[in-house]
Amino acid sequence: MTDNPSVDDVGMPVHGLFIGSRNGDAWSAEERDAVFTETSRLFKSFTIMDALGCYMGRPVPTLMVRVGSNDVHRIRELAHVLGRLTKQKEVGLETMGRFHSIRI
């Protein structure tokens, strides 16, 4: 049970967005803050984590944004917003264990 009446006890899907570093360097505090700011414009609750991804056999510093939401359209909107912000060609999206590449 929760004290927040807007939260469904059944839960909601958790979506993960994966944003790889374009130049292979670690994400700067400024870049991370910009991702936080843009994400907070669309969602009130989320988690941003640093991760190490792998692309074509090479390690890639990756930001992972996790959001619980039933609004898939808004999640895809966030993928496009963050993709443009970070100059990506694609952003990875995982929903309920299924991975998709979102072209920007």
Predicted regions and their residues:
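Positively charged, small/polar-rich N-terminal and surface patches that mediate targeting and assembly
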Residues: 2-104
